[in-house]
Amino acid sequence: MSLVLRHCHSRSRTFILTRHLSSKPSSTKVPLLYKPEQDDQTDTVTLQLLSWGKGASGQLGGGIEEIRLYPTPVANLIVSQSSFALSPTPGRRVSSTNPLGEVGLSCGLFHSSLLVNGKLWIWGKGDGGRLGFGHENPLFVPTLNPHLDSVRSVALGGVHSVALTSLGEVFTWGYGGFGALGHSVYHRELFPRLVEGSWSGKIHHIATSGTHTAAITESGELYTWGRDEGDGRLGLGPNRGPNEGGGLSIPSKVKELPIPVTAVFCGGFFTMALTEQGQLWNWGANSNYELGRGDKVGGWKPKPIPSLEDVCVIQVASGGYHSLALTDDGKVLSWGYGRHGQLGHSSILNQKIPVVIEALSDEHVVYIACGGSSSAAVTDKGKLYMWGNAKDSQLGVPGLPEVQPSPVEVKFLTEDDGLGPPNVLSVAVGASHAMCLVMRSAS
């Protein structure tokens, strides 16, 4: 399949919620987590948060439970239809617009978050202080964190969390032993703490993984910090790297990037960055073809992926050892480690270079996500597809084998709640659970 693209246009990717939908009062069975102020309810629509997969640590948000076999509602949101959009997502090119309100999801290893209009709800496992409430206890339902406000974007890591505010400030909290918090020390932070980086101006994009974190300034400079076990995932080069415990807790500029970047995604042991023109650069570990260059040569120096130099990428997402790229014409490519079926090519073979997922070729994909060893895609018609590791029911389709190597559509069981079929807007995937945000029209 030819993927030579002349220009990079993300023509409908801002996800402004402007469809002419009406909403009815939702069922009392699903908690109403958010609604506009009393004087701002003339133009509203109902969004619904659903979760599935393994939930022993509370990450599903529905109380104490072990597992959900299929997507189940967690909360309803009533939002202003004309002014809400999806919040900035790690690995996705940032829209120039800044709507009045934004909504977004994030899944960490065993914790989850929901962002609505600058406010952050967070829940799941609490070890290391990753929830930011001043303790390490788990929370089994979405709980508003009172220590943050005006949040624009959230990225959840393994045992830590990162938030970006509308003022361009970065806050981190949780386990600090890997240096992923960026506070020049390696102890835990039980409350959100401001990262005092050496950058000038505001930060406009963040990302994190299990052990390292990245941030991009408004001018396109990239800073990284956290763990680097000699694989080069921080992109900093010799003599600029880890010290205590293999971590670097000082945000440091990636000087070898020759051009400004607008989005970044942190994989397990590697890093991906996107330019404004849609060119994808990466660096770090490559023993499983994570860098998509056709060989296993890794390293700290950022380089473009040769086979994608004429392809316009609008979003990149990575798991532990694999990646997805979404092009501006709605195609999805995958590469890297494939033994759990996470590449979507109907096999469990590793993939040396990015290859289009043919099973999705008839769909126009608008959003992608990766878990540790699973993958997801949302289409322009609001459908959700998932594939990869299904051991913990994290694909949301009961009865699948533990390895699902081709995309399957996730179906939704809707109760008689006065709302119509779910129209999926976004998805987030953790190690063994997943969540999605759907729009519910009136039935």
Predicted features and spans:
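Short glycine/serine- and acidic-residue-enriched loop/turn motifs that recur at repeat junctions
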Residues: 35-39, 43-45, 49-70, 82-83, ...
